């Protein structure tokens, strides 16, 4: 955990960019020391905070940065579609490794641990709690429970075709309801991230467009293939 108070953490990330340093799974950059380097480079570039996946990656990154860290663990479970920090042990491990904010799946889906129990554990361990939601109803429920941050993270990722554009309406609606809003999900250009802040997001998380080199190179390579010469 950084030496910032909860209010200082929120003030630090307010109106700022959160760099999600999550390499492609099992790719050449999926190593804790590389994640830590990505995190440091992101802060040099102007990020206000970081989102780090995995306890080992968090352990490698925390000693190298003072900025707020949102931490998660991703798992693929046989009996639940929930992937983001599904177990209380994950929360315990992230808190011990230095997370300032712990994010959990906030969707209304079958899960091994209730949202209420996850929130209680996060706060007991002295961390701020973030809910990764997909709908306004989910976000409002998590706000009422006492989550400190509500994200649009899961919008478009709970079934069906994934949209191309971010869910601006969800960001607007969450803000209108009084949430501290993290815009997240498909904000893959500077203009889209800027728009998120302009429509009311308190901060915006960008991942693939910053730290997944395979994706970024692919965007360029695919576009070049369509060039008419």
Swiss-Prot record:
A GO cellular component entry from the record: cytosol
GO terms under biological process: carbohydrate metabolic process; N-acetylmannosamine catabolic process; N-acetylneuraminate catabolic process
Reaction equation(s) it catalyzes: an N-acyl-D-glucosamine 6-phosphate = an N-acyl-D-mannosamine 6-phosphate
Xref: InterPro entries: Aldolase_TIM, NanE, RibuloseP-bd_barrel
EC code(s) of this entry: 5.1.3.9
One Gene Ontology term of the molecular function aspect: N-acylglucosamine-6-phosphate 2-epimerase activity
Pfam families: NanE (PF04131)
This protein's UniProt keywords: Carbohydrate metabolism, Isomerase
Record's function text: Converts N-acetylmannosamine-6-phosphate (ManNAc-6-P) to N-acetylglucosamine-6-phosphate (GlcNAc-6-P).
Family: Belongs to the NanE family.
Protein name (record): Putative N-acetylmannosamine-6-phosphate 2-epimerase
Species the sequence originates in: Actinobacillus pleuropneumoniae serotype 5b (strain L20)
Gene: nanE
């Amino acid at each position: 955990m950084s030496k910032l108070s909860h209010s200082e953490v929120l003030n630090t990330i307010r109106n700022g960019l959160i760099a999600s340093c999550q390499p492609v799974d099992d790719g050449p950059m999926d190593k804790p020391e590389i994640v830590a380097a990505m995190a440091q480079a992101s802060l040099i570039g102007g990020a206000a905070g970081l989102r780090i996946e995995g306890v080992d990656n968090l352990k490698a990154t925390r000693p190298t940065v003072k900025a707020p860290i949102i931490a998660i663990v991703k798992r693929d479970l046989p009996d639940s579609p929930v992937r983001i920090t599904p177990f209380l042990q994950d929360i315990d491990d992230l808190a011990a490794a230095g997370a300032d904010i712990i994010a959990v799946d906030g969707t209304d889906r079958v899960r091994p641990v209730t949202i209420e129990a996850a929130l209680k554990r996060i706060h007991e361990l002295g961390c701020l709690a973030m809910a990764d939601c997909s709908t306004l109803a989910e976000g409002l429920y998590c706000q009422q429970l006492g989550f400190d941050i509500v994200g649009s993270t899961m919008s478009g990722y709970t079934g069906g075709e994934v949209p191309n554009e971010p869910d601006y309406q969800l960001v607007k609606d969450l803000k209108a309801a009084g949430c501290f809003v993290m815009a997240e999900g498909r904000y893959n250009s500077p203009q889209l991230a800027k728009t998120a802040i302009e429509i009311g997001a308190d901060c915006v998380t960008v991942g693939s467009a910053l730290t997944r080199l395979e994706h970024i190179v692919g965007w360029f390579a695919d576009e070049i293939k369509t060039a008419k010469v």
